[in-house]
Design a protein with these regions (language model features):
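Phosphodiester-processing cores and adjacent nucleic acid-binding clamps
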Residues: 1-178
């Protein structure tokens, strides 16, 4: 979100028609964003990717990001599903990387819970505004999760989207990420 204005200016200045996608990866608290997480339940949050599809969605992303920092910050800026539901209008949602909740449920062989959560997200964002992510990153667990995502898409009709978990632009920047 912090680079949205610069991205928009660069897209307008581009020689070809470039449509910027403004979005962010958010941390979703497993319980309330107002409760600190404890070591006994892991890190206490999951990842989710949100992309504004219109001006209302952009304003809602700003609200979610601001609330994550001002109300939900505990080691990381977090929101919860209650707040996400309140500000879901105008936003497209992707299921997230391996740290996404659906993927974590698949990792624990909780397929029925993963399917229910995917249906809940589809209901929250609207039928045409939630996608299940597939990634190919050389991680063996990712391949297992991808197989589960494909089966889930066939059962639920939720569409698939191919993405990747990008953390740096150039290979030489990898040291800063690591």
């Amino acid at each position: 979100m912090f680079g949205a204005m610069e991205l928009n200016k660069a897209a307008k200045a581009a020689p070809k028609d470039v449509k910027p996608l403004i979005g962010c990866e958010v941390y979703i608290a497993r319980e309330s964003m107002h409760q600190p997480h404890s070591k006994k339940n892991g890190n206490g949050y999951n990842h989710l990717t949100l992309i504004a599809r219109n001006n209302e969605g952009y304003k809602n992303l700003i609200q979610l990001a601001s609330s994550a920092y001002t109300e939900g910050f505990h080691f990381r800026p977090r929101i919860d599903k209650e707040l996400l539901s309140k500000y879901a209008d105008g936003i497209n949602c992707l299921s997230g990387c391996l740290a996404g909740e659906i993927n974590q449920l698949f990792k624990l062989d909780k397929d029925a819970e993963a399917e229910q959560l995917a249906s809940d997200f589809r209901d929250m964002f609207g039928e045409d505004h939630f996608w299940l992510e597939l990634q190919r990153n050389g991680i063996e667990l990712q391949d297992k999760v991808n197989e589960n995502m494909v089966r889930l898409a066939k059962r639920t009709g939720i569409p698939l989207v191919a993405t990747n978990d990008i953390h740096y632009l150039r290979h030489e920047d990898c040291q800063a990420q690591d």
